[in-house]
Regions:
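Active-site-facing substrate-recognition patch
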Residues: 1-60
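PRPP-dependent phosphoribosyltransferase catalytic core
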Residues: 4-10, 130-183
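Short, well-ordered alpha-helices that flank and scaffold nucleotide-derived cofactor binding pockets
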Residues: 55, 59, 79, 83, ...
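Short glycine-rich phosphate-binding loop at a beta-alpha junction
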Residues: 62-71
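Adenylate-forming
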Residues: 67, 184-185
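Short, glycine/charge-rich flexible loops or terminal/linker lids adjacent to PRPP-binding catalytic cores
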Residues: 72, 77-114, 122-124
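A contiguous pocket-lining binding segment that forms or flanks enzyme active sites
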Residues: 106-139, 144-145
Length: 185
């Protein structure tokens, strides 16, 4: 398995770790942003990270029926993990603000499912995907991602399996530190 340091070096090498002023999908502000699409543009390096994450998932979960990834960020990572674990992989996408299964995908009742994302910050997308799983009578056995930046403060109750844990402070718009407020978005 790749070490945290080697994984972080790959993020830096692929210019996936950006610095500046960013508004995250959660609406929170941050001085750093992880653009996993940059990592994924280097398939050999992305495969190394995904292989290491897949090994962690395999160690923790013995019975996986299906991998579910939220579009857009989780699709390629979900596919790569599914390939490595030899598991069916599907994705859900937002329609009118709600995650939905389309394109003929379905979730079988009783299936044991792992939700895989690129980056988890607040856990909002994962929790929304969870509802889709439980509404279909399936069971979420775990969550996994390339980068966990929750610092243990997400709405996800289970331990997240990740390749990289990064604590990057986030701020509400009305509580920005001066140094961040001076950087234009």
């Amino acid at each position: 398995m790749l070490s945290h340091k080697k994984s972080l070096d790959i993020l830096k090498k692929t210019n996936a770790l950006l610095e500046g002023h960013f508004v995250l999908s959660s609406g929170l502000h941050s001085s750093k942003y992880i653009q996993c699409a940059k990592l994924l543009s280097y398939p050999v390096l992305a495969e190394k990270i995904c292989k290491s994450l897949a090994n962690k998932i395999k160690k923790k979960y013995k019975k996986i029926d299906l991998i579910l990834a939220p579009a857009m960020g989780g699709v390629i990572i979900g596919y790569e993990i599914g390939k490595l674990l030899k598991k069916e992989t599907i994705f859900c996408e937002r329609v009118n603000g709600k995650f939905t299964l389309r394109r003929g995908f379905n979730i079988n009742k009783g299936s044991k499912i792992i939700i895989i994302e690129d980056v988890i910050t607040t856990g909002k997308s994962s929790i929304e995907c969870s509802k889709l799983v439980t509404d279909n009578g399936a069971e979420i056995i775990g969550y996994a991602c390339i980068i966990d930046r929750t610092n243990g403060k997400s709405n996800i109750k289970q331990k997240i399996v990740s390749q990289i844990e990064l604590y990057i402070p986030t701020f509400e718009e009305n509580k920005l530190p001066k140094s961040l407020s001076l950087i234009h978005i």
